[in-house]
Regions:
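Short, helix-capping/interhelical loops that line the mouth of catalytic, cofactor-
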Residues: 29-48, 92-155, 184-193
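Bacterial N-terminal signal peptides
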Residues: 11-25
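Solvent-exposed, charged/polar functional surfaces in cytosolic regulatory/catalytic domains
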Residues: 59-62, 66, 135-139, 176
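N-terminal secretory signal peptides that target proteins for export/translocation
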Residues: 1-9
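Short, contiguous alpha-helical
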Residues: 50, 54, 58-61, 73-114, ...
Length: 193
């Protein structure tokens, strides 16, 4: 069901485009004493992001599980392109990045995200990936209509913006994982539907 993935990608692009819109910048923001209301919103931001992360998680975890353990050190033309991540490094980068993005929501991870980058076995890496998605889900569940666009932290980010960036970042690396799978003769699980 390639169409489902295509629509998901288009939906993700639209959300990221909307969230990066100048109309959402502080210069266009409502005064602090005016509550933020999403016109006609029937679904909370937490539900929207939760569904997006669940959909992404399904594809990314399936791709991580599809690569055989003996291919986790594969990198395309490793000798020619110095510094290209291996498949394992793509997956650990996604996992550790989830913690990086969402620790700013005030949640404390139960793992050292730097240690994730040192994992070597497929089983450990896939577990770390799944755990990082649990952490991401926990974070996006805290996004409300009232706090979605509030700026916080040193970099004046918003929860909605961080969640969108987390999704976009992982989609980039998922795309690379798909190429690695195909270079090894493996059809990505999302393309098999």
């Amino acid at each position: 069901m390639r169409t489902k993935s295509c629509f998901a990608a288009v939906r993700m692009f639209a959300i990221c485009t909307l969230l990066s819109s100048p109309a959402l910048s502080p210069a266009f923001a409502a005064p602090a004493d005016v509550p933020v209301r999403l016109a006609g919103a029937q679904t909370s931001p937490a539900q929207v992001y939760g569904k997006l992360f669940s959909s992404q998680q399904e594809e990314v975890v399936a791709a991580a599980e599809a690569m055989p353990a003996d291919k986790y050190n594969f990198a395309p033309t490793n000798g020619t392109f110095q510094g290209v991540r291996t498949f394992a490094q793509q997956v650990t980068h996604i996992a550790s990045s989830q913690y990086y993005f969402f620790t700013g929501f005030g949640l404390k991870p139960s793992v050292d995200s730097d240690a994730i980058d040192k994992l070597t076995s497929k089983d450990e890496i896939v577990k770390a990936l799944k755990d990082s998605y649990a952490f991401a889900h926990q974070a996006v569940e805290t996004i409300t209509p009232e706090n979605a666009f509030e700026q916080f932290g040193e970099h004046k980010n918003t929860r909605a913006g961080i969640a969108a960036m987390g999704l976009a970042h992982t989609n980039d690396h998922y795309g690379q994982m798909v190429v690695y799978l195909r270079m090894n003769g493996i059809i990505p699980p999302a393309s098999r539907k």
